[in-house]
Amino acid sequence: MGPTEDPTADLILLTQQEALLRFDSFDPDTAWKLGNLLHAALLARNAGGTVEIECDGQLLFACTTPSAKPTQGDWIRRKRNTVRLLHRSSYAIGREIARDGATLESAHGLSEIDYAAHGGGFPLWLRTHSSALDATDVCVGSITLSGLPQRDDHNLVATAIADLLNIRIPHLSAAI
């Protein structure tokens, strides 16, 4: 099985990423730095994309690249909704339902009109203790990107967060 065919193997890596990619603090300056990393990464790929970062319901960063499509705003909204409700990356939710042969509707009672289980949405976690695996950490927002194939959307967000935090993370192999 190739990397995109094995949801269980992907979920192991995604769970590790989600445990590691947590902030000690997050403010508008942090959002600006992270958003600009994502914007620069899209431009380096000559990709049309949209980026949004929100915390506690407040929009802290939003941008598009020149060739972004108008529909990407709706993808951002749907991925953000998924992350904010389920506190997992939108790609992890997609891999879970692929593994289980389910849909958003059957697994979570969610309509695809308002939710998306596609890569690019990532939870914004704040640590409340020193351990990255501490169950009392709090999901306070989302970091969302749309414009690339979903696996690449996810990888770009996870890589940018890791770069900003200056940590190494396990990576999913690139989309095939």
What residues fall within each predicted segment?
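Short, positively charged
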Residues: 29-32, 97-107, 166-170, 174
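Short, solvent-exposed cationic patches
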Residues: 84-85, 155-176
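Structured interaction and signal-relay segments at domain junctions
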Residues: 43-110
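Amphipathic, alpha-helical segments enriched in basic
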Residues: 6-13, 17, 28, 99, ...
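Intrinsically disordered, low-complexity terminal regulatory regions
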Residues: 1-72
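Ordered alpha/beta subdomains of enzyme catalytic regions
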Residues: 19, 80-82, 148
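Extended hydrophobic
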Residues: 105-165
